[in-house]
Regions:
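Catalytic cores of nucleotide-sugar-dependent glycosyltransferases that transfer UDP/GDP/TDP-activated
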Residues: 1-238
Length: 238
């Protein structure tokens, strides 16, 4: 039973938005804030896809690149965890992707684990591009993350004196994947490690690479209508 959760971004196509049905709503606790969240759902090829609705955070002209991205994605992580009992879904594994979901494991294991509903859940964290890390000032520990300063001071959430969402995702993951076995090796070296190679080397026994998949029907250059000209292996002489 695999289900997906994403923010309800403005950029989602109207054809999908027309299918969305409200499922539940409630309040997310984020540090000192109490914030509304809504959950809408579609069935996409037999898979349930949930959309976290909060227009203040997600009704914008692009997906990310805002001054409050630290707050937006901390909110998203807490909203996902908060909604699970309300939709009656108790996953064995939560698969998180990149820095935007880096706090999922932090919140799960430092806060939500107090509730037996969550205690069996594990985190898989996938790194697509280590360059983008979600780096923020230490002050967000109190103002946004709302967890003890100790988690910064002991290095769990800290890198180079800042809160680092990417590192947080790795520290709290039960297992880490990257986009290839080669990349999994490369990021253990300073040139590719983006200041996180030291931690990555300590965690290498729970890191592996999985090659990105490709839908050969959707991305078939012989039939693809979105490219300037179709072609096959026979188009170009040897």
């Amino acid at each position: 039973d695999v289900r997906l959760v994403i923010p309800k971004y403005s950029q989602i196509a109207d054809s999908f938005r027309a299918q969305m049905k409200p499922v539940t709503h409630g309040i997310v606790n984020l540090a000192w804030r109490q914030l509304y969240y809504g959950v809408e759902e579609i069935d996409w090829n037999g898979i349930k896809v949930y959309f976290i609705d909060n227009e203040w955070y997600f009704k914008r002209d692009r997906l990310y690149g805002f001054d409050d991205d630290d707050e937006r994605f901390a909110y998203f992580c807490r909203a996902v965890l908060t909604m699970l009992p309300k939709i009656g879904f108790q996953p064995d594994i939560i698969h998180c992707n990149d820095w935007h979901t880096g706090l999922m494991g932090v919140f799960l294991k430092e806060d939500f684990y107090h509730d037996p509903f969550y205690q069996h859940m594990k985190i898989i964290y996938t790194i697509h591009n280590l360059k983008y890390q979600g780096i923020y000032p230490p002050s967000i520990m109190r103002d946004i993350i709302g967890l003890p300063q100790e988690l910064f001071d002991n290095g769990n959430l800290e890198c180079d004196g800042c809160v680092n969402y990417m590192k947080s995702g790795m520290v709290y993951a039960d297992y880490i994947t990257t986009v290839s076995k080669t990349y999994a090796q490369e990021i253990t070296y300073p040139y590719f490690g983006e200041h996180l190679d030291g931690y990555i080397r300590t965690a290498r026994d729970r890191i592996t690479g999985i090659i990105n998949g490709l839908d050969e029907d959707a991305y078939n250059p012989a039939t693809d209508t979105h490219i300037a000209a179709t072609y096959t292996a026979d188009t170009f002489p040897a």
